[in-house]
Amino acid sequence: MTPDWRTFPGPLPQRDGNQAVWRGGLVGCGALSAACLLRHHAAPLGVPLPDRDTLAGHLAAAQGAFRLPLPQGPRATWPWAWLSGLNTSLNDRNLPLRARGRWGFHLHAPLTAHLDRLFSAGLPVIGFEFSTREQHYGLLSAYSPGPELPARLHVDGSSMHLAPRIGLGGVFWIETVSLP
C-alpha cells in the first residue's frame, strides 16, 4: 500500500543537518532540531538569538545531552530532558512560547491526531524515534497515518517511524502562550 503522505503546508524552519562539533563531539540531533524550531518561532517575535549552531550548543547543555561511546561522539538526550531543557531556555529568555511533546509506546492514533492538528495550524513538528532501527530527533516535512506512523525528515527526505513496533516514538512542537 502506498503511503498517504500529508505534507507540511507552510514554510519550514532552517534544515537541521550538518551538526556542529561541540565539546569534543557532535552537538546532537535533539539540540540541533530544537535550535531550528526555536529560531523559527522567535524570528516573527523579533527576538535576536545566536546562530543555529551556537544556540544548539546552549540547548545541548540545557537538555543534558550526553556523548555516546561511538565514533565521532554523537550525543543523545532523553525526551523529557529535551522538553524540559527547551522550556528552561524559553523561560530564561522570557519568550511567550512553550515546548510541548507526546511520546511513548504504540501511540499511532494519538500522535496522528496531534500531527493532523499541528500541520493544519502550520506549526512545525519535530519527530522522535528511539527503536532498534533509528535513534533520532528531526524536523518533519510530511507524515503518513499508517502502521508505525512513517514521517519524512525535512533535512533530506529520509524516513523515521513515530510509532515503531519496538521502541519509543513521539512528536514535539512549540506553541505561543500568554504570559502573566
Where are these regions (language model features)?
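Active-site-adjacent structural segments surrounding the nucleophilic cysteine of cysteine proteases
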Residues: 1-79, 131
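Conserved active-site-adjacent core of cysteine acyl-enzyme catalytic domains
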Residues: 57-180
